[in-house]
Curated annotation (Swiss-Prot):
Entries under Pfam families matching the protein: ACBP
Residue runs in coiled coils: 405-431
UniProt family annotation: Belongs to the ATG37 family.
Protein name per its UniProtKB record: Acyl-CoA-binding domain-containing protein 5
GO CC list: cytoplasm; peroxisomal membrane; peroxisome
Species this chain originates from: Gallus gallus
InterPro entries: ACBD5, Acyl-CoA-binding_prot_CS, Acyl-CoA-binding_protein, Acyl-CoA-binding_sf, FERM/acyl-CoA-bd_prot_sf
Length: 492
């Protein structure tokens, strides 16, 4: 018992030192109720029960202290010490760490053991798990459960993958069905009628999808209607495949179908880079419809001038539309009628050149946010004409240069607007300051002027001056009279 009492006394003394060392203006300020508790427990632990009389009404603080102390009744000193330390434990975490607090923590020890014991007694499941972990066979069983759960998760993932593969296969079958082909043909006819093309039309043209009919003697619109359903089918299949990144890229730019959309208000460089090929393709389709007879003439010139076999020429004619669109997408590269590259490899077959273009555009398609690189080495933009008449189609302006110019123009206009706003602001400030000064001056001088000269006074001089001028002669006469009377009295 003596050892227990000494432990409680030591803890109590350490807690009292902590309370006494608290600064008056420190970060931790205990409440009045808390200080009353500490006071009552301290008095009970040091002096015992309260035996002094209650203070008078003139000492309200003493009365509160006496009430708190006397409320403890016959509590023993040891119990008061324990209660004092327990109250200290409640606020110990919120107190700043000082030397006294460290000393108290060393004396008290790990006072969270009660929570740990209660947790261990209340949770039988935790003890069971600890027993399982301590025994070797149970560890194997647990590992087996873990492995089975992992294998179950893997089987679920495999099932999801199989479902995705089945969906992809079903999408491919749907793409091959004639119903989908008819729907794609209708969508593509509508897009051709509106001169609007999706951005995914460009890489699909480069993936080797070729038409099987020559352009000799056929109308361009009929050829487009015949060739583009297969392109739209491949486009839909490609978008339903694993290339989700390109799907998001195309869906984000499908609304850019008008030339009136300004590049200044685009959200990103990627959107700007995708807007240029759309404008080029739109203008290219219009020129293709307007100059169908140029296609026939140039195709006959190609058959006469080339040294390739006839089936190679036919293949070149079939590739005419795809190569023309290739040239429209290119920033640099000269394309003439008939799908013939103006400055490509000398006498090389069109099939080899087509493969090279496919590789380049495939790389462009895989990269997001990059500009389309030229395939040909021509110094001018895309051209289309009859033998060299230089009929322009597409856009010759550099997208990056035009973007920089537009940004510069916008910045200049913004600076001008800001200067105008600043000038107007300075003018308003000056007018406000002048009005304030005039109002102050009027308020200062108005009372004086009202005293000197009222608004109803018809004369220029003030009423006071006029009254003084009238009264002054009488006053002067009276003073002279008084002076003369005194002088007479002195003489007498």
């Amino acid at each position: 018992m003596a050892e227990t009492g000494s432990v409680h006394a030591t803890r109590f003394e350490a807690a009292v030192k902590v309370i006494q060392s608290l600064p008056k203006n420190g970060s931790f300020q205990p409440t009045n109720e808390m200080m009353l508790k500490f006071y009552s427990f301290y008095k009970q632990a040091t002096q015992g029960p309260c035996n002094i009389p209650r203070p008078g009404f003139w000492d309200p603080i003493g009365r509160y202290k006496w009430d708190a102390w006397s409320a403890l009744g016959d509590m023993s000193k040891e119990e008061a010490m324990i209660a004092y330390v327990e109250e200290m434990k409640k606020i110990l975490e919120s107190m700043p760490m000082t030397d006294k607090v460290e000393e108290l923590l060393q004396v008290i020890g790990p006072f969270y053991e009660i929570v740990e014991d209660k947790k261990n007694r209340g949770s039988g499941l935790t003890s069971d798990l600890s027993n399982v972990m301590n025994s070797t066979p149970n560890i194997k069983a647990v590992n087996g459960k873990a492995e089975s759960s992992d294998s179950g998760a893997e089987s679920e993932e495999e099932g999801l993958r199989e479902e995705e593969e089945k969906e992809l296969q079903q999408n491919v079958k749907d793409c091959k069905s004639p119903k989908t082909e008819s729907l794609a043909a209708k969508d593509l006819e509508n897009s051709v009628a509106n001169d609007c093309y999706k951005d995914s039309f460009i890489p699909d043209m480069q993936n080797g999808i070729q038409t099987k009919s020559a352009l000799n003697g056929l109308n361009v619109e009929e050829e487009i209607k015949k060739t583009e359903p297969s392109l739209e089918i491949a486009n839909n299949c490609d978008h339903r495949g694993a290339n989700e990144e390109n799907t998001e890229e195309v869906s984000g730019t499908q609304h850019l179908t008008s030339d009136s959309d300004s590049e200044v208000y685009c959200d990103s460089m990627e959107q700007l880079g995708l807007e240029e090929p759309l404008e080029i393709i739109t203008s290219a389709k219009g020129s293709l419809k307007r100059s169908s007879h140029f296609l026939d003439v140039d195709h006959r010139l190609q058959l006469e001038n080339t040294d390739l076999p006839r089936h190679a020429c036919t293949t070149a004619g079939n590739l005419q539309l795809g190569t023309a669109v290739d040239g429209a997408v290119q920033e640099k590269g000269e394309v003439k009628c008939g799908g013939e590259d103006g400055k490509a490899s000398n006498g090389a077959p069109h099939k080899e050149k087509k493969d090279g273009e496919k590789a380049d555009f495939y790389g462009v398609r895989r990269g997001r946010g990059h500009r389309l690189h030229p395939v040909g080495d021509g110094s001018q933009g895309g051209q289309m004409g009859n033998g060299g008449d230089g009929e322009r189609w597409g856009s010759d302006r550099g997208p990056r240069g035009s973007l920089n110019e537009q940004i510069a123009v916008v910045l200049m206009r913004l600076q001008e607007d800001m200067q105008n706003v600043l000038q107007r602001l300075h003018m308003l400030e000056a007018v406000t300051a002048s009005q304030a000064r005039s109002a102050t001056l009027q308020s200062n001088y108005q009372p004086a002027s009202s005293v000197k000269k009222p608004s109803w006074w018809p004369f220029e001089i003030s009423p006071g001056v006029l009254a003084f001028a009238i009264v002054w002669p009488f006053i002067a006469q009276w003073l002279v009279h008084v002076y003369l009377q005194r002088k007479r009295r002195k003489l007498n």
